[in-house]
């Protein structure tokens, strides 16, 4: 009887390992929260040392400090009303989130790509909706 219990417990542990790995590779909830609040300082805590940024006419790879300034400027000019997460997923070590950012000046499509809980790419583009 102990052998059966031990085998069953081992089987359950082995099955749960892929689930734990998938959980850890999602876009951090703090990123979603920072977008919803329009908080560039909170978002900067998740930026990689260099991040590909597409916001307005800014389209390049920027240092964390430069990217934080550009994001803060965007949030100053476009006060955030809400952020709605539309889709998220992951593959290998990367994860992504796609959503709609509603601001006082219009709606924007947001795409976030992360690796190891750090934002590698952030795109905020005017939505056609």
What are these regions (language model features)?
Residues 26, 47-82:
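Short solvent-exposed beta->alpha transition segments
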Residues 56-58, 103-104, 115:
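Short, flexible beta-strand-to-coil junctions
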Residues 69-107:
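Surface-exposed, charged secondary-structure patches
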Residues 24-39:
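Short, aromatic-enriched amphipathic alpha-helices that serve as compact interaction elements
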Residues 54, 100-102, 127:
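A generic structural motif
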Residues 107-129:
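Short beta-strand edge/turn micro-motifs at domain boundaries
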Residues 42-43:
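Solenoid-repeat scaffolds in large eukaryotic assemblies
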């Amino acid at each position: 009887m102990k052998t059966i219990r031990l085998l069953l417990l081992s089987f359950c542990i082995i099955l749960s390992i892929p689930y734990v790995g998938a959980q850890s590779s999602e876009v951090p909830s703090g990123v979603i929260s920072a977008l919803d609040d329009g908080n560039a300082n909170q978002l900067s805590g998740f930026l990689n040392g260099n991040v590909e940024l597409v916001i307005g006419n800014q389209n390049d790879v920027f240092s964390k400090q430069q990217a934080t300034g550009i994001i803060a400027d965007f949030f100053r000019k476009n006060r955030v009303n809400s952020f709605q997460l539309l889709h998220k997923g992951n593959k290998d070590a990367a994860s992504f989130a796609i959503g709609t950012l509603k601001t006082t000046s219009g709606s924007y499509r947001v795409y976030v790509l992360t690796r190891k809980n750090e934002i590698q790419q952030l795109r905020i583009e005017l939505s056609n909706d």
